[in-house]
């Protein structure tokens, strides 16, 4: 079959089909290249959020509130962040504390008596970049809800989705607008404040040695329903700043 299109002297189609307009692809931005402001500086807008949980509490029977809402939204992966996604997509870096798991593994046998054990289907990971989340911390009291194998699947799932994670001993390193950013994450359960005061400076220096321009240190700390940091948090936070951290969150 031969398709013939005839144009008049003005370039209008007189016979045949109007050709599809050419689509100019959006230019891709290389994150390793610096983006300068008019004054020669580099401006980075970062957003940090606290505990973020998707999926279900497997200790509860029946369909979870999250699953019911997802069904109501006809599987729309944008619904968890719909009220803030415009903000998170517009910034340069969004980091959250991912408090849960992305796994098909069963309960951690050491935590069967816990009231809350969080698990999300690995496919739900797509909700994070859809909502503007760029990187996560995995230091909290729910990452082991489905045991060591559940945590490992969570890590692999995040990386496969292009989301770097920070966990103790596993810093996340990202480059944004040519700025190399290192992220460290810790939890303080069991009164580890003095241990971390001794440990964290070396971890910060290790990221500096790798060429990080900015070092972010994230702690999962404090007590529920407390509105102010306790003395141990203040000591650890101050020691972290003194050790060279640019941001403590």
Show where each model-derived region lies:
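Acidic, metal/ion-coordinating pockets
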Residues: 4-11, 20-249
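Short linear proline/tyrosine/threonine-rich motifs used for host-factor recruitment
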Residues: 13-15
